[in-house]
């Protein structure tokens, strides 16, 4: 049971890390941390999983390239704004509604579905993050919290139900649109840092879905 809890905590941390990475522009402190030993160790651990080896290497290469990029933090902030705070035509907007909604507009059914799920599981969106509920950062934060709920549940049947809810969420609320989101990033992200980030996210979600399927 302790191994189960520890593994789930690692899963949640990865979802929360990706949520924070895609929620806002990186600060100078963030960029420094990405060059540090802790991030190197973290990525080395992820890269030991065969399914994540290539996307982790690509992400590492993107981090290393930052070292030679003039005004790296400012340029990354510009990349973030150009991709994620732009228009559907010029950017790669991080909302599920853009990719799998019926209208192609914001706050479509995926956002409504997320609001229902957050109410059902008692997981609130951070008040300071004023974005539609189907923003990638909100969805990833929700997944991390759903994982921790399973850790805290003492009843075995309820805990199993929460694990199955995670599988459904990854398949129906993440993997149904983030591969298209990754392609949109690739087409518009000249430097490639955020493309590498989202490609790593897609690979991790696919791996996590396989893990959860094996838990059935």
Curated annotation (Swiss-Prot):
<comment type="similarity">
    <text>Belongs to the TorD/DmsD family. TorD subfamily.</text>
</comment>
<dbReference type="InterPro" id="IPR050289">
    <property type="entry name" value="TorD/DmsD_chaperones"/>
</dbReference>
<dbReference type="GO" id="GO:0005737">
    <property type="term" value="C:cytoplasm"/>
</dbReference>
<dbReference type="Pfam" id="PF02613">
    <property type="entry name" value="Nitrate_red_del"/>
</dbReference>
<dbReference type="GO" id="GO:0051259">
    <property type="term" value="P:protein complex oligomerization"/>
</dbReference>
<keyword id="KW-0963">Cytoplasm</keyword>
<dbReference type="InterPro" id="IPR023069">
    <property type="entry name" value="Chaperone_TorD"/>
</dbReference>
<keyword id="KW-0143">Chaperone</keyword>
<dbReference type="GO" id="GO:0006457">
    <property type="term" value="P:protein folding"/>
</dbReference>
<dbReference type="InterPro" id="IPR020945">
    <property type="entry name" value="DMSO/NO3_reduct_chaperone"/>
</dbReference>
<protein>
    <recommendedName>
        <fullName>Chaperone protein TorD</fullName>
    </recommendedName>
</protein>
<dbReference type="InterPro" id="IPR036386">
    <property type="entry name" value="HscB_C_sf"/>
</dbReference>
<comment type="function">
    <text>Involved in the biogenesis of TorA. Acts on TorA before the insertion of the molybdenum cofactor and, as a result, probably favors a conformation of the apoenzyme that is competent for acquiring the cofactor.</text>
</comment>
<dbReference type="InterPro" id="IPR036411">
    <property type="entry name" value="TorD-like_sf"/>
</dbReference>
């Amino acid at each position: 049971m302790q191994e189960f809890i520890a593994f789930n905590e690692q899963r949640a941390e990865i979802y929360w890390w990706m949520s924070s990475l895609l929620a806002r522009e990186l600060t100078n402190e963030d960029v420094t941390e990405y060059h540090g030993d802790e991030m190197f160790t973290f990525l080395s651990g992820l890269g030991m999983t065969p399914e994540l080896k290539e996307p982790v290497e690509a992400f590492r290469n993107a981090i290393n390239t930052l070292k030679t990029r003039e005004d790296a933090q400012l340029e990354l902030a510009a990349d973030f704004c150009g991709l994620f705070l732009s228009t559907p035509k010029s950017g790669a907007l991080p909302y599920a509604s853009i990719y799998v909604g019926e209208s192609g507009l914001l706050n479509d059914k995926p956002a409504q579905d997320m609001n229902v799920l957050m109410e059902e599981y008692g997981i609130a969106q951070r008040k300071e993050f004023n974005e539609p509920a189907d923003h990638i950062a909100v969805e990833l934060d929700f997944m991390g919290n759903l994982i921790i709920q399973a850790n805290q549940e003492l009843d075995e049947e309820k805990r199993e139900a929460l694990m199955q809810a995670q599988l459904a969420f990854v398949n129906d609320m993440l993997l149904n649109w983030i591969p298209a989101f990754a392609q949109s990033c690739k087409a518009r992200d000249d430097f490639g840092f955020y493309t590498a980030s989202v490609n790593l996210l897609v690979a991790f979600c696919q791996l996590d879905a396989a893990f959860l399927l094996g838990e059935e």
